[in-house]
Every structure is written in structure tokens, then in C-alpha cells.
């Protein structure tokens, strides 16, 4: 039996690594993509994933990535993100452009190719596939010194909303996940005086899985996750 494929773009050592482990455990053939594919070697060995070098801001790279996928693409996670901080008067326009290319345009290219592939697939229990966008609270409200990140995440959220309304009736589940808080990562633990102040990547991954498993009679288009101590 051919395994379903779960693609994770913008893969690395944080949340995307937790997603890769989870989808592999769930029986998916995992495909990891990043600009620097070399950094994914150990994760690929651990999960049995295939690895592809891909610049998500390059349309040809993204097309080649999807063309190389073997098997039914049931999950695509658009995980690219770029953060540029600074006072609005001091920001370098080229740095801002590059950040928007990664977060907004990169999400568009990945979402577009995922939709193209899934629309051609036979549905399974009425569902052709699931496309998930990793968002942030910056896609809901802008913060000082963080305009480029907010611009990218607002654009990504708008993309996800448009795709949800267009593709849900065609059997493709699209959702945007607002990750409202910092994520525990190797080398980035929460302060001793602020226990439970960061999100556990394994717990976030379970939310992604729940979205994939949602019955189409009750699909979520947006969902927020945050630490229980977070003020919002």
C-alpha cells in the first residue's frame, strides 16, 4: 500500500522537526524541504524522510519540489518565515523585501503548488488533502519594531483565508495556525522565573495532526495555540 505523503517546507530543528517525527509515526512518508538541505540530515535519518533543497521564493524550485514527490500528497505544511526587527525609520528596504518574499510569497508558491497537486488527486473519504500555514500572533496584530514580520504574517493569513474559501468546497482543507508565543527549541528554554511561558513543539504538532484528522463537517480555518499563562 502506498503511504500518504506529508510535505514540510521551511524545515529545521524546531517545530518542523516535531512535525516530521509525528507524521512519520502516523505512517506518512515525510518529505522535508529547506534552502539548506544539509542541516536536515540527522532528522531525515531519524524519520526516514526524503530531503530536498528548495528556495521557496523561487517558483522553479517549488515546482521541482512538488514534481519530485512520489505518492499521494495528503498534507502540505507551509512553514517558511523570516523575522526582521528594527525601528520603522531604520529598516533596510532590501531586508524587508527579502523577509516578505520568504513569508508571504514563499507561502503563496507552496500553497499554489499544493493546491494544484491535490486538486488532481482522488479524494479519500471526501478529502483530497490538507494545507497548513504556520502563522503567528503578528498576523493578528502588529508589534513595535516588528513591522516586516507583521506584514508577512498578515499576508500569509489573508492567503490562507482566501484559499480556505476557495478550496474547502473542493475537498481541500486549508488552515492557518496562530502560534501565539515563543516555542521551546534546542538551546532555547524558558526562563526559570517564568515556568510554562513557552509552547512545547510536540504539543503544537498534535494540534496540526488534529487539523489533518478533522471531519470535513467541522473544519477549522484558523486556530490559535498559546501557553496557558499567556495574556491575550
Map each language-model feature to its residues.
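C-terminal helical subdomain
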Residues: 169-184, 190-232
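Conserved glycine-rich Rossmann-like NAD(P)H-binding loop of the short-chain dehydrogenase/reductase
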Residues: 26-41
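Conserved glycine-rich cofactor-binding loop
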Residues: 12-13
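Catalytic loop of short-chain dehydrogenase/reductase
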Residues: 123-155, 160-161, 165-168, 183
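Rossmann-fold cofactor-recognition segment
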Residues: 46-60
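A short, exposed helix-loop element centered on a Lys and neighboring polar residues
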Residues: 111-112, 161
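Substrate-binding pocket helix/loop in short-chain dehydrogenase/reductase
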Residues: 87-88, 95-100
